[in-house]
Amino acid sequence: MTRDIASLAQVDDGQPRNYVGGDWRTVDGDPGQDVVDPATGDTIARTPFATETEVDEAVATAREAFPEWKATPVEERIQPLFEFKALLEEHQDDLAETLVSEHGKTKTEAAGELRRGIENVERAIGIPSAMQAGHLQNAAPDIDETAVRKPLGVFAAVTPFNFPGMIPLWFLPYAVATGNTF
């Protein structure tokens, strides 16, 4: 599994692809669906639809990466999130323009949505301090209490279409920072 997320910005040939296990994979199934600018009716892109087999492969890849990722020290796990945040900020204007053309949002709304998404990445970067396990002696007579936080495994999110610059960032950075794969 690669931890260099800079390659996320490297595919620009117009082919619908999914990002799995550190690689861009061409979708073998359905050719995807047109993305239409609601203001003009013009087709501006295509989005891929993965086959069931491709989804199963993505889940298997995430499952394979999980043991190593959960064992990665938390300070190391958040490093890709710093890179991700920097990329989001670097490309914020382009991403906002994409939201405007794909969803008919105003520029102000699109920029605000992205800012709120970036704020979630910032919060996830701060997760190590919140992950400290607690221990309470004598919570009740002869009872000590200990909280243990452990990664759970593979996470996925099916998010609504209306806030694509924000809602996925309610899930992905927190899952990754806490040692889960996504």
Regions found by a protein language model. Give the residues of each.
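Hydrophobic face of amphipathic alpha-helices that form TPR/SEL1-like repeat modules
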Residues: 1-39
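Short glycine- and Lys/Arg-enriched binding-loop motifs that mark or flank ligand-binding interfaces
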Residues: 18, 25, 100, 122, ...
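Secondary-structure boundary/capping motif
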Residues: 27, 109, 164-167
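A short local loop/turn or secondary-structure capping micro-motif enriched for an aromatic residue
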Residues: 34-35, 52-55, 165
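Glycine-rich loop-to-alpha-helix module at the N-terminal edge of alpha/beta enzyme cores
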Residues: 42-131, 142
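Conserved small-residue-rich beta-alpha loop and adjacent elements
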Residues: 134-182
